[in-house]
Amino acid sequence: MPTPVYIYDAVRTPRSKGKSTGTLHEVKPIDLAAGLLVELQKRHDLDTSYVDDVVMGCVSPVGEQGSDVAKMVVQNAEWDESVPGVQLDRFCASGLEAVNIAAQKVASGWEDLVVAGGVESMSRVPMGSNGGAMAGDPEFAVKTSFVPQGIGADTIATLAGWSREDVDQYAVSSQQRAANARDNGWFDRSVIPVKDSSGVTILERDDFIKPDTTVEGLAGLKPSFEVPGSMGFDDVILAKYNTLDPVSYTHLTLPTSVGV
């Protein structure tokens, strides 16, 4: 029988724009994540020597997020030196997969107490910084029918029959729900303010939610992946899905978040 697994607590940083103009641009990834470990230790008066492992997902594990960033974060938070750390990359599912693996470790009886999550600072380590065969090897890309994720999303929308207006309406409702949750305190216990080395608060709550977004406003934006699609990726998609009409580009890329 698997050992029962419980998530005891969940915390994150507030989110801001994932560009150099974002509020958290000056904060290093290891400081973002270490602040959360420090808060967990204080909140539960945790003897960190009991932690069996820290598992962290990271999509671009290079530069300031490179090496084994999970272990770097453990050290930066000044947890017990016996606590190990492991970094994993499953693209956008990296943080979730870290939690899955932590649960598997406990369920198997191998370990008892595991901290899991993810760290990513897109304002300091831009998406695609780590390269890879998909990005830099055209022969591999054609062989595997690779297209960028955004074009993949637009292909799914085309196959499923979702219109541009459908996804714009969903985007608007998502912004409104996020603002409602923030403004009504639903995130208060889980969002941990980011502070500088002097203890001064840099960001206390999510500052890039846009509740005033409208379907009409979004309709005026150009699809983000229409141009890359016309440069050859559409041909790759249509070769794989030969019954598909031309890809309908519905996907909009707004500036993304930075946080943990």
Describe the predicted segments one by one.
Residues 18-19, 66-67, 125-127, 205-206:
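Short, well-ordered secondary-structure micro-motifs
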Residues 2, 107-160:
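Flexible glycine-/small-residue-enriched beta->alpha junction loops
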Residues 58-112, 132, 143-151, 212, ...:
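Conserved catalytic cysteine-centered active-site region
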Residues 11-14, 25-35, 43-45, 169-252, ...:
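N-terminal extracellular/periplasmic Venus flytrap/periplasmic-binding protein-like
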Residues 1-77, 84-87, 92, 155-164, ...:
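Conserved active-site "lid/cap" helical segment
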Residues 88-119, 157-187, 252, 257:
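Active-site-proximal alpha-helical scaffold in enzymes
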